[in-house]
Amino acid sequence: MSRFFANGSDSESESSEEEVQAPNFNKATAFQFSDDEEEVKRVVRSTKEKRYENLTAIIKSIRNHKKIRDISNTLTSFEDLTKAYQKALPVISKEENGITPRFYIRCLAELEDFINEVWEDRDGRKNLSKNNAKSLGTLRQKVRKYIKDFEDDLSRFRENPQEESENEDEEAAAHDSDGGLDAGSDIEKREPTVAATKLAKSVPSKLPVADDEDSDESIDWDPDTESETESSEDENQYQNMRERFLKRSTEKDDKDDDKRKDKRKEQKIKLRKRAEDEDGEGWETVVKGHVVEKPKMFEKDAEIDIPLVLAKLLEIMSARGKKRTDRRLQIDLLFELRDISDQHELGVPISVKIHFNIISAIFDYNQKISEPMKLEHWALLLEVMQSMMKLLLANPDIQLSESVAEEHEEYNATPYLIRGCPLAAVERLDDEFTKLLKECDPHSNDYVSRLKDEINVVKTIELVLQYFEVNGSNNERCRIYLRKVEHLYYKFDPEVFKKKRGDIPNTTQTSVDIMDRLCKFIYAKDDTDRIRTRAILTHIYHHAMHDNWFQARDLILMSHLQDNIDAADPSTRILYNRMMANLGLCAFRQENVKDAHHCLVDLMVTGKAKELLAQGLLPQRQHERSAEQEKIEKQRQMPFHMHINLELLECVYLVSAMLLEIPYIAAHEFDARRRMISKTFYQQLRSSERQSLVGPPESMREHVVAAAKAMRCGNWQACANFIVNKKMNTKVWDLFYESDRVRDMLVKFIKEESLRTYLFTYSNVYTSISIPSLAEMYELPVQKVHSIISKMIINEELMASLDDPSETVVMHRSEPSRLQALAMQFVDKVTNLVDVNEKVFDMKQGNFFQRGNMGNRGDRGYNRNQNNQGGNWGGQRRDNRNQRNRNQRGHHKNQQNQNQQQQQQHQREQQQVQTIDEE
């Protein structure tokens, strides 16, 4: 054996030779290969090393992107990570028995926490760039979808995330043969060559490289079990001979290492449990950070009485609002003080005082008024509020009022006087309940859970209402009555209709009766316009919801709200818009189509019904709002359970417009001065007519437009089928109470208006038409057809007369035929075209011929005798133009006279219709 290999050996038989050759050891380690061998420096790595190194590199880049909040690049790196993990799956299933590496689970958990943190930071989200904001939503969806396959691994990781650091210590003790992954650190790959070089420099050659537990184990270097290819790969893997002959772990060693790790872990757990069992009573878990010692309430031998408790209460509440006050500790101290007071039986007044201070402390816990309070504090607030009001109602001699000064409080003799305002507390509680509802997703179970709390909120309001009916002033009673009304006005009560039908006794109290009692008290006693205005609006809304059309209409007309609503605050204007929308629905249900259209036209013509009803913000107008305005508008939004169905509202508006607009269009088809009743419906109809190919209707608007086209032809059956069908019933009509009655009313109106449209359209075709045939065609009673035609004749809409013996309608040829009307329109347009052409010609000629000297060209040889001729020709054209202007002015006066006559005739028609209705 050569001396070089002898230096690299570690056997005992050659130990003396190693000692002799010790001075030459450095030369052997510094031995270099030839130039050809130095050029090729390949490191042969296994597939596991390659895949894991790729994963760790991507994970490191993700962490760097998270530090600088680069969401866009984080999304890109996450996509690369999923692809790399997909490639590494075969290695994981083979090497790790299908168990996902812990460092990968850790990366997913950290990424999920990072996304949730950024998503909950709303102010920070607004400051993100457009690209990062868009990438955040995409990344959140992809991560939530991706981690569903790792839920069990993530849950185990979150239960014991510190296990990874223990693995790190164990792996540091036992060298990893693959160059290993440090699971506790940033999961960076260790290079075997670097580790071996450091070990060669730091450890003497005569000492073994392995740890103490492995020192007695020998490595089997059997040349017969290794192929030539493996030896060649080993030779190419290392740069010098010392690295080649350093000890490396085999598969057997890896298994032994795993066993030793498990044994160490079990021993640590046993020792920890044993220590906890032995010394658990004398030890406490130390919380990280500064620990605030809970102050003692009273001295051990102190005599607990009312002055001492009040002094302690004042001491606790004096820290209210200060910067370093622990608000949670303050609430806990107040509860402890209440318990001490109850234990020593200091009386109900002191308990009420502590209750009210607990309520104030809970309200103070949330510093930002715009954000909702925590659910634990909300449940606590409801409990304490109801407990305080029950104490007040059970003890009438206790007066809790804000008019009592603190120095005049009385706890020893009746009447007990305590400073506080339960009305302000219940108003704040009601506002917090609304904020909680707005914060929840309306389509989630959380919203339903929070909505169940409304029962407790209403009970609390009832308790406060009972207290102030005995002890409160008129102003305070009006305020608490309004809170009660605002929780009642939008709720539908079927008992009202049962009472109308006589199914229940008349003595039964319904929500309408409660609203009448509360609102009438506010009308009589309130001295502020806002409370009275809101009470009127809620009263009208409730009447309209229960089909009390005439009461609601009379109330709004007598109050003159529409005249001064523009001066009201935004929340009151929102309530006014909601009232008008519900009033329009009520008018539609009560067959008052024209009134329904008038109520809804102001809301729907703007195209911003969603914003006007405070049911959401339109994304199209986002650029028009600043961040502060958007925040304010979101605070004004109505809770989801109070929303009005916008599709129902739009459908009622379009159907009402169709029933009014289509007969009017048929009656004034050739009228150039025809006005539009509904601009929105007219635009929908015109846009549909401009389309070359129109498919079957799908949306609600398309159904209404298709029904309008059928009505223009007088086809009532097709019109009714488009309005009343399975799809429209599901979307719209089934949302009404007594929907069958509404559908029957719709079909009846469609028949009547289709009959009117048919007579307007085809009156110039008939000389006479039979009334029974019209009744059979439109499936209406003969008396109804006779009544409709009579009204049309009286209103001078139809030029005809009724022949009662023969039951026919005789048409009068007073109106021009279709061909004549088109010819008249053509003549008017040609006349206008001629006038326009003459004006254009005059503008092009200018004033050349009006100058007497023909442009003053006498010096160029023109005859001066021609000046008069040119001047006369220009004067003639001027006379013609003046005459034409006079004719136009005369024509304009004639048109004005005709318009005045038509207006007078229209007024006479309205008077006649009113007299007929009165009869």
Curated annotation (Swiss-Prot):
Compositionally biased spans, kind Basic residues: 883-894
Listed Low complexity bias regions: 895-919
Gene Ontology CC: one annotated term: eukaryotic 43S preinitiation complex
Bias-annotated ranges (Acidic residues): 11-20, 162-171, 210-236
Modified residues (Phosphoserine): S34, S165, S177
Keyword list, A-Z: Cytoplasm, Initiation factor, Phosphoprotein, Protein biosynthesis
Summary of subunit composition and partner proteins: Component of the eukaryotic translation initiation factor 3 (eIF-3) complex. The eIF-3 complex interacts with pix.
PANTHER family with a match to the protein in the record: EUKARYOTIC TRANSLATION INITATION FACTOR 3, SUBUNIT 8 EIF3S8 -RELATED, EUKARYOTIC TRANSLATION INITIATION FACTOR 3 SUBUNIT C-RELATED
Family: Belongs to the eIF-3 subunit C family.
Primary role: Component of the eukaryotic translation initiation factor 3 (eIF-3) complex, which is involved in protein synthesis of a specialized repertoire of mRNAs and, together with other initiation factors, stimulates binding of mRNA and methionyl-tRNAi to the 40S ribosome. The eIF-3 complex specifically targets and initiates translation of a subset of mRNAs involved in cell proliferation.
Protein name (record): Eukaryotic translation initiation factor 3 subunit C
Organism in which the protein naturally occurs: Drosophila willistoni (Fruit fly)
Lineage: Eukaryota, Metazoa, Ecdysozoa, Arthropoda, Hexapoda
